Amino acid sequence: MNIGEASKVSGVSSKMIRYYEQIGLISPAVRTASSYRTYGDNDVHTLRFIRRARDLGFSVEQIKELLALWRDRSRASSDVKAVALEHIAELERKIAAIQDMTRTLKHLASHCHGDGRPDCPIIEEMAKGGGAAKTEINPRFGVASLK
């Protein structure tokens, strides 16, 4: 099947199929005499695996590892579980960070008058700049702020 057909049956866009081929997630496609890519059922199965892994938020590197484990019939399920547990821990860290940002923004928004005044704790916090968000108490507003 051509790339359009493979895209349709796998649920992966043609652009992403080319990208996955470029970075080595899938094997280079067989080419016709006119240089069109052709894909078989195994390729589509691999693309569906990749799509599902992406849907679960796995990184490209993690997907490479999962694909290697999937292809290894002598794999230990403990290896697969370790990748999944590592990913769960990362997702939980991201959730905690998002919850922290949400709490901070809610607190700042509750202290912004939202009227014609020019002063606003939200703008003042963002104007401080800085690197990664870290929660800290801001004595001026008595709120958690981003540092």
Curated annotation (Swiss-Prot):
User: Per the record, what is one GO cellular component?
Assistant: cytoplasm
Question: Coiled coil located at which positions?
Answer: none
- Choose any GO biological process term that the UniProt entry carries and state it: positive regulation of DNA-templated transcription
Under the heading Pfam families, the entry gives:
MerR, MerR-DNA-bind
* Compartments in which it is found: Cytoplasm
The record's listing under InterPro entries reads: CueR, DNA-bd_dom_put_sf, MerR-type_HTH_dom, MerR_fam, Tscrpt_reg_MerR_DNA-bd
Q: Which residues form the HTH merR-type domain?
A: 1-69
Q: Name one GO molecular function term.
A: DNA binding
Q: Which residues bind DNA?
A: 4-23
Is Metal-binding tagged as a keyword?
no
**Keyword set for this entry?**
Activator, Copper, Cytoplasm, DNA-binding, Plasmid, Repressor, Transcription, Transcription regulation
Q: Does the keyword Cytoplasm apply?
A: yes
Q: How does it assemble?
A: Homodimer.
User: What's the stated role of this polypeptide?
Assistant: Regulates the transcription of actP. It detects cytoplasmic copper stress and activates transcription in response to increasing copper concentrations. In the absence of copper, it negatively regulates the transcription of actP.
- Name under which the protein is recorded: HTH-type transcriptional regulator HmrR
To which species is this protein native?
Sinorhizobium medicae (strain WSM419)
